[in-house]
């Protein structure tokens, strides 16, 4: 049983470190769809959970700004404990060569606790830093880290 749990935990750690992004070519579609998986609150042994998410980006709304190439994003994730987060916000894309990109983002949203972690308020702000590598035209492999905070809107702000 311990070996099975160790294997499952190892697999989840590996999956949580990898974010696969599937995007259609611009000539085919103006929309980019990202599917991802990972760990929610990986540092809390009692509350950590596997999560699955989806994100949409409209290529027609991309703007070149003094902060980088800005793009609106909308998405959601759900955890194995039925906690869910729906968000919309902006991300900035910085190219670090032909194949490597760095993408910070800020996305306010609504959080539902479900049977998961109590974050203290329904309104949460997600900040994220993502690095991805272009494997081929329209396919990227990336790694990201994000943080949810209610900015002390609630009594509790873990």
PLM region spans:
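Cleavable N-terminal export/targeting peptides
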Residues: 1-28
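Short loop/turn motifs that connect adjacent beta-strands in outer-membrane beta-barrel proteins
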Residues: 23-30, 44-45, 60-70, 95-102, ...
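Predominantly the C-terminal beta-signal and adjacent terminal strand-loop region
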Residues: 26-28, 132-158
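Transmembrane beta-strand segments that form the barrel wall of outer-membrane beta-barrel proteins
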Residues: 31-41, 67-79, 102-112, 144-149
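Solvent-exposed loop/turn segments connecting transmembrane beta-strands
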Residues: 40-50, 76-87, 96-98, 116-122, ...
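Hydrophobic, lipid-facing positions within transmembrane beta-strands of outer-membrane proteins
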Residues: 50-54, 70, 84-88, 125-129
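Residue-level signature of outer-membrane beta-barrel architecture
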Residues: 56-60, 92-94, 133, 145-147
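An anionic, turn-rich surface loop/hairpin at beta-sheet edges
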Residues: 107-125
């Amino acid at each position: 049983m311990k070996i099975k749990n160790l294997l499952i935990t190892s697999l989840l750690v590996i999956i949580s470190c990898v974010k696969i992004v599937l995007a259609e070519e611009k000539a085919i579609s103006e929309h980019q769809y990202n599917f991802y998986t990972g760990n929610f609150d990986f540092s809390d042994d009692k509350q950590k959970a596997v999560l699955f998410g989806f994100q949409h980006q409209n290529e027609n709304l991309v703007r070149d700004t003094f902060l980088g190439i800005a793009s609106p994003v909308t998405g959601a994730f759900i955890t194995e404990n039925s906690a869910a987060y729906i968000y919309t916000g902006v991300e900035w894309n910085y190219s670090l060569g032909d194949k490597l990109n760095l993408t910070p983002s800020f996305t306010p949203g609504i959080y539902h606790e479900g049977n998961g972690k109590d974050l203290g308020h329904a309104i949460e702000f997600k900040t994220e830093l993502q690095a991805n590598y272009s494997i081929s035209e329209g396919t990227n492999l990336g790694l990201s880290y994000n943080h949810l905070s209610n900015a002390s809107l609630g009594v509790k702000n873990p």
